[in-house]
Amino acid sequence: MRGWFARFRSRFREPRAGLVVTASTELAPGHYVLPDPSDGALRIVGDDLVLDGQGVLLDGGGRGGVGIVLVGCRRVVLRNLTVRGYAWALVAIDCEELLVEDCDFSHNGRSDGTFLDITRVDEGAGGGVKLVRSTASRIVRLQATGQDIGVDLVSCRGIVVADCDLSHNAAWGIRLHGSTDCRLERNRAHHVNRCGGAGCDAAGILLTWGSHRNRVAGNDLRWSGDGFFLGNQFSPPSNDNLVVGNDGSYSPNNAFEATFSRGNVFRRNRACWSNYGFWLGFSTDTVLEENLIADNRIDGVHWEHGARGILRANLIARNGRDGVAFTLDPTNRDFPDRCVSTGHELCGNRFVANSRAAVFLLHTTATRLVGNRYETERTPVLLAGDTRENDIQDVFRTT
């Protein structure tokens, strides 16, 4: 018996506050209340190791701090860990090739009732995983709910976040702040909201501050402040992202928003039952193709002060005002170099029963409509203001 107990003790390590992990370790099962002494309740120091916490709950007791901290580590695996009651469950800085899998990092730092500042790198009270200046890492099958942020990627590159449940948070399911070439795939980030459901810039997924060339695919973003939010008004633009096969419906604001940006592509998404399906203010060279944009309270697509947009093969139906609205406010001189609404192309779209008009052009020029189909539309195309030099080739046979 003494020999068996000795072998058990040698295999498992009992967590304690301030524990430094330097080699592969299995933590002894149990519920451990471990306050953060200042630099993490547990710290990982070293490369090429595995921390396995099957049956372990690390509990910060709601006193803030960080559950697990890694700085400058490479090829570390964290699996089967449950961490709650801290500001952040896991913070990794300047790390490479991390793998976080099958962990529960829920019920950490949370705030509510205040409008979020999407440009602040330290916005939010905390959450599940925060990676800073880290690369080539994977976060898979993570549960991180009931807090401000599920996964926060700051100045990262090549991160994969897949098959995670990041729902019912109060700020963002996933935030990318200055992070590029990442893949966000098949995650659940629904019901991410605050301010009593008004949103206050909460979103299922947020991209900001120069987050380029990311792939956002197959995520459930319903019932969030915005489903998908790419916002950059007073920060570097976030360009050339591919957003495909996501559902951002039932937002109190916008199912999908992409502003002050260039070259983003939205393909085969669902944008329904929100205030707006797509809000694309001050963006250029944006592509919408094969999306379902229906039953929104105001416009299916609202695009102010934009240029060179392409809308191709979308179904745009039963929106409360216009199917697509291209607009310009000549009195808005906040961004004088963007005081245009011009050069858009709509081709092969199907418009059905939008309340005021299928397409509304206000102070819009050099825009082309060709091969679109109009069904039970009261007004296929409505022109207003200084709208001129447009190429409208559609034959308006409404059925």
Predicted segments with their positions:
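Right-handed parallel beta-helix/beta-spiral solenoid domain characteristic of secreted/periplasmic
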Residues: M1-A17, T22-P37, L42-I44, D48-Y86, ...
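Acidic, glycine- and Ser/Thr-rich low-complexity intrinsically disordered tracts
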Residues: R2-A6, S10-F12, C339, C347-A353, ...
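Parallel beta-helix/beta-solenoid
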Residues: R16, T22, V45-D48, G53, ...
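Extracellular beta-strand/beta-solenoid scaffold signature
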Residues: R9-E14, D36-L42, R63-V69, G85-A89, ...
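Proline-centered turn/helix-capping motifs that create local helix->coil transitions or kinks
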Residues: N108-G113, V192-N193, G225
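Terminal non-domain segments
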Residues: M1-R9, V140, T145, A162
